[in-house]
């Protein structure tokens, strides 16, 4: 499928900050379901624009959120404001069907995905790749991934490597157990030997075979929970 990838800028919900981002859209007539991509901290944008292009080839409108304009470790307030700006921007994209909206979170973007789903009822699905880099003790109370996830009611798919250096497998197993105990619609898939960043081509931890498997699983999850 022919797709269009372009640089875009939207205004944060604070009404002041410009957030440079990327938008990928299918060329065929819409409206199309939407994926908001919340990138990780490390690496250039190229790996994420490739992911956006791939999603557009599947038939999704995809926005790579440029949250790094805030720096590598922003506080929660600006993140929420920028997420609001992204939602407003997507509402202006003619081909975007916000009744079918998913969020992909990578690394720290996994935490932001949980924040987004708690704040915006339009979000119907979350997919997290090597995410939930657990936050330092200085993080505000209730802001750990465990706590954020408890307030999420939409289906969530978590794709994680057993050798992740940023979000250790033991932490992820505990999170999986907590989500199950709470009765959440949440699927965890662990890839033996995969490191942090396995799904992003420009990341040092990239693993082509694991990336392909994880995106195949994400595509099936979207087809089940979002396409209808």
At which residue positions do the language-model features occur?
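A conserved short beta-strand
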Residues: 122-133
